[in-house]
């Protein structure tokens, strides 16, 4: 399958591109800096189009022009090349124009939907629209259009946050659920609106308090009690993805006596999986990343190096680890990671805790070299 993703470099776009490529699809990425000629060329080859491009922060006039124009440019390109392939579209719940959603952004998204449905009627193509509420997860740009991303970024750094409208209720979908919905929508055989999971609901003040509780636990090394797949577990995974590199290290206190030494790694009353990894000299392990699973690596024998690189970035973060200086390293979601034995003749023994049990049906593990 060859897929065209417009808005490919945005928050949802980056996740969708990774998911499509992991499934074996060829993906053409179209961004705001590309021209109509490139769009037309991509449309000629596409088996399916995911239309994510749009404008969400601008003047009322720019919102209307930007979102409607993006839809018109896509339909013009598809019409020009005569390709009635399926089109999957991300819109917004604000397109309902109900209550506080009766605004310029909502009107621009509604008009964009209308452009695409008219194209569907004229061309015979299937157009499926997903009206999304707020979406949260790793890789979302802070201080822009997401209160979750903004709060996570600031709180992870110990910075103050401005909590406005504390009682306002947010409706949120987790990014993995959105990607699953987009991929499911690609199988739809008629035009219309796609069903979505029930969104999580949380007040702004509650969101801030929960994230601040994660920060408080961070210094103590205590893991919060999280039900796998719950809204809170997904919020915590999101929070971890915003930690600055220096916050990934967990210094540990070592207690010595005549019997040897003792150090407490973590405290938790539930969840996760602990494994022991033995790596031979010069050998790398890992070379993959996870969407939501996060891990903690702790060297108990030998010495080695942890290498981390955020997916899509080129900067590699390196931590030298030695059993003589007990230190644990957090591996956040969305980071390619590898463990390398740097000793010449000693095995590297590492205790690894993972936030989720391994599920062969949904391993949440994506191969990538670092």
Listing of model-derived features with the role each one plays in the protein:
Residues 313-314, 342-370:
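Double-stranded beta-helix
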Residues 3-19:
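N-terminal Rossmann NAD(P)H-binding glycine-rich loop of SDR-like oxidoreductase domains
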Residues 117-129, 133-170, 175-186:
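NAD(P)-dependent short-chain dehydrogenase/reductase
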Residues 184-252:
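Mid/C-terminal beta-alpha module of Rossmann-like enzyme folds, strongest
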Residues 69-113, 118-123, 127-128:
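Conserved Rossmann-fold NAD(P)-dependent oxidoreductase catalytic core, especially the SDR/UDP-sugar
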Residues 246-287, 293:
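A short glycine-rich, His/Asp/Glu-containing loop-to-beta-strand
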Residues 311-333:
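Short acidic-glycine-tyrosine-enriched beta hairpin
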Residues 34-84, 94-100:
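NAD(P)H-binding glycine-rich loop region in Rossmannoid oxidoreductase-like domains
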């Amino acid at each position: 399958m060859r897929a065209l993703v417009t808005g490919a470099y945005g928050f949802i776009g980056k996740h969708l591109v990774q998911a499509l490529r992991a499934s074996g699809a060829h993906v053409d990425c179209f961004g705001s800096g590309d021209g109509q000629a490139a769009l037309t060329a991509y449309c000629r080859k596409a088996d399916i189009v995911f239309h994510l491009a749009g404008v969400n922060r601008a003047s009322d006039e720019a919102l209307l022009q930007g979102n409607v124009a993006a839809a018109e440019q896509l339909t013009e390109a598809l019409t020009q090349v005569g390709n009635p392939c399926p089109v999957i579209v991300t819109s917004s719940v604000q397109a309902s124009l109900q209550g506080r959603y009766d605004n310029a952004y909502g009107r621009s998204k509604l008009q964009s939907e209308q452009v695409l449905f008219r194209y569907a009627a004229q061309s015979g193509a299937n157009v499926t629209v997903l009206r999304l509420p707020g979406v949260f997860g790793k890789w979302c740009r802070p201080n822009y259009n997401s209160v979750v991303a903004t709060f996570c970024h600031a709180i992870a750094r110990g910075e103050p946050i401005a909590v406005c409208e504390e009682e306002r209720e947010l409706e949120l979908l987790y990014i993995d659920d959105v990607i699953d919905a987009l991929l499911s929508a690609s199988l739809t055989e008629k035009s219309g609106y796609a069903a979505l999971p029930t969104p999580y609901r949380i007040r702004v003040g509650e969101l801030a308090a929960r994230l601040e509780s994660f920060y408080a636990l961070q210094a103590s090394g205590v893991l919060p009690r999280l039900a796998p797949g719950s809204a809170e577990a997904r919020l915590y995974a999101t929070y971890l993805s915003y930690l600055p590199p220096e916050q990934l290290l967990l210094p540990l206190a070592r207690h010595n006596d005549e019997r040897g030494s003792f150090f407490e790694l973590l405290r938790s009353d539930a969840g996760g999986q602990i494994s022991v990894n033995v790596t031979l000299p010069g050998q790398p392990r890992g070379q993959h990343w996870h969407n939501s699973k996060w891990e903690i690596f702790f060297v108990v024998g030998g010495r080695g190096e942890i290498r981390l690189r955020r997916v899509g970035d080129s900067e590699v973060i390196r931590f030298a680890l030695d059993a003589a200086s007990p230190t644990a390293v957090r591996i956040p979601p969305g980071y390619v990671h590898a463990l390398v034995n740097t000793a010449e003749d000693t095995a590297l023994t590492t205790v690894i805790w993972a936030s989720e049990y391994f599920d062969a049906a949904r391993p949440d593990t994506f191969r990538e070299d670092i």
